[in-house]
Amino acid sequence: MAKRSVLGLGLGLGLSLVLGCASSPPLDLELAEVPSAEELYRQGNQHLEGRRRFLLFHSTDYSKAIESFQDVIDNYPYSEYAVLSELKIADAYFDQDLYEEALTYYRDFADLHPDHEQVAYTIYRAALCHYRQSHGPGRDQTATEQAIAQLDRLISKYPQSPQAAEGEAMWRELRTRLAEHAMGIGDFYMDREEYQSAADRYRSVLDAYPGLGLDAEALYKLGLCYSEMNRDDEAARIFQVLLENYEGSDVAREARDLVPAAN
């Protein structure tokens, strides 16, 4: 009787397995079919274009757009659509003012695809990310310096690109900001009668940021620092350079009274 019980149990289990297999769909039918790279890319663009609302306004679903583009990258990493999707994700973050996220994608694109035709664009946009996070002359200038570093790279490596032409104006603006920042620190030391520290800052403006419109002022204040430190010969030489090169400036007229030979 014990043998019949074991045999009956075995037959019962075998029958259950057969019935279970018969009632379960094949594994490949359970897996959802992944759309093509082109279709996923098209879906991402549709989410970016958004839907018209209230006649004039469009609602853009950046999250779904990024998800679609990421699906392209995950499922078709070697397709051209994957490369384009990297750019689309970067731009989607940028358009939401999420500059750190955008910056990561722009920098990675330039590093991973150094020969791609859009590299100049990504370097320029990386500079823009830093630019949008930068501050005026009176505050920390780390982002300003990072933006300039990207623009230096853009202008030196891709001088004929449209982005280089656009970047030159930004480059000049940012360098002027750094010069103004240095001048502000010089003024800070000057007000506290720390003339050597002030002179070092004014000198740095002349050495590092010439031709940005601050040369005359920097020369004048450098001369004043030397005068206050009783380095009269150096002060006279600086004032003379000021008079010879910026004769019509307001500070040159003030310096004229401080140079006996010029009167």
What are these regions (language model features)?
Residues 2, 20-263:
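Acidic, polar-rich low-complexity tracts and alpha-helical solenoid repeat scaffolds
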Residues 8-18:
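Bacterial N-terminal signal peptides
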